[in-house]
Amino acid sequence: MLTITSYFGFLLTALTITSALFIGLSKIRLI
């Protein structure tokens, strides 16, 4: 159970970082 929770936590963190980087690149390109 702990491994599943940590796995989803890691996946959520990776998704958040990827989204932040993607939005950052989009803003830079728009400017």
Swiss-Prot record:
MF-aspect GO terms: electron transporter, transferring electrons within cytochrome b6/f complex of photosystem II activity
A Gene Ontology biological process term: photosynthesis
Subcellular location: Plastid, Chloroplast thylakoid membrane
UniProt keyword terms in alphabetical order: Chloroplast, Electron transport, Membrane, Photosynthesis, Plastid, Thylakoid, Transmembrane, Transmembrane helix, Transport
Cysteine disulfide partners in this protein: none
Principal location listed in the UniProt entry: plastid
TM spans (from-to): 4-26
A GO CC term assigned to this protein in UniProt: cytochrome b6f complex
SUPFAM superfamilies membership: PetL subunit of the cytochrome b6f complex
Recorded superkingdom: Eukaryota
Bilayer disposition of the protein: Single-pass membrane protein
Record-linked PANTHER family: CYTOCHROME B6-F COMPLEX SUBUNIT 6 (PTHR37266:SF1)
Summary of subunit composition and partner proteins: The 4 large subunits of the cytochrome b6-f complex are cytochrome b6, subunit IV (17 kDa polypeptide, PetD), cytochrome f and the Rieske protein, while the 4 small subunits are PetG, PetL, PetM and PetN. The complex functions as a dimer.
Similarity comment: Belongs to the PetL family.
HAMAP family: Cytb6_f_PetL (MF_00433)
Job description of the protein: Component of the cytochrome b6-f complex, which mediates electron transfer between photosystem II (PSII) and photosystem I (PSI), cyclic electron flow around PSI, and state transitions. PetL is important for photoautotrophic growth as well as for electron transfer efficiency and stability of the cytochrome b6-f complex.
Protein's name in the database: Cytochrome b6-f complex subunit 6
Organism, scientific name: Lactuca sativa (Garden lettuce)
Protein's gene: petL
